[in-house]
Amino acid sequence: AEMYMGLVELGVGLLPAARGSLEMLERFRAGCPDDPSFNPLPMIQGAFMNIGMAKVCVGAEEGRTFGMLRPHDQITLNPELLFHNAKEMVLGMARAGYRQPRPAKFRLPGENGATAIKWFLDGMTRGGQITEHEFKIASLLSRVLTGGDTSTRVKVGQQHILDLEREVFLKLCGEQKTQERIQHMLTKN
């Protein structure tokens, strides 16, 4: 199915908010053991790279590969059937007794994980691959995805991640370079 999907907010100096970062984190953390000794950093790095590189998938199957679509997300090729298929899916869920899942809890590496990602980013900055402002944005994204002030010994809830998302989003909205990027996008693109 033809589709273009991605979290491209970093291009204008922001990060995906309103659950965008949280959703990507949840999708890459799916299936991870609930074990304080488990290192979640490789999964977090997958989410980080998708968001940080503003990857855009072309097509539904690539969307699954990138974690933009979940394995159980349905695809409707015919736009005329979209409403019908959605209605049938919802009715089927209701008949099956669907209940909203409990909010996820995460064991995240906190500042230790963010430091590892920042080390990688520092190399990209020194190599001229990203600007200082992009380093700042990506560093703040790493703080969100690694859980801020926490460690794998502690479980944090979705609201904790959402609070970090909001805090970082608002901080970036106040950055002059972000405002310039947004203005450029609105006037030139």
For the regions a protein language model found, what residue spans apply to each?
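CoA-thioester-processing core
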Residues: 1-39, 45
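Extended hydrophobic-aromatic, low-complexity segments
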Residues: 8, 16, 60, 72-73
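Intrinsically disordered, low-complexity segments enriched in small/flexible residues
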Residues: 26, 30-55, 59, 71-73, ...
